[in-house]
């Protein structure tokens, strides 16, 4: 699947909230998200850029997929991307 080229950082954070991520703080132009489930914890920083660069988006999605034991395609489907 191709990654969207017009996705904003705030929109990505909103879609990640469907997976249980919560915004815990905002510092400057970055959002800090945390996911807690079953004793596991994952922290993630997302820039609020308009739009996110493809390499940045790919790196964020790769990190989430590894933390959640999902493939990239499964993650994209869950996020409706």
Task: Identify the residue ranges that each predicted region occupies.
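C-terminal structural segments of small proteins and small subunits
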Residues: 51-81
């Amino acid at each position: 699947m191709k990654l969207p080229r017009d996705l904003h950082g705030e929109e990505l954070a909103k879609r990640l909230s469907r997976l249980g991520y919560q915004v815990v703080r905002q510092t400057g132009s970055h959002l800090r998200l945390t996911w807690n489930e079953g004793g596991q914890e994952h922290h993630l920083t997302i820039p609020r850029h308009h739009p996110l660069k493809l390499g940045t988006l790919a790196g964020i999605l790769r990190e989430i997929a590894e933390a959640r034991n999902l493939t990239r395609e499964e993650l994209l489907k869950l996020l409706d991307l």
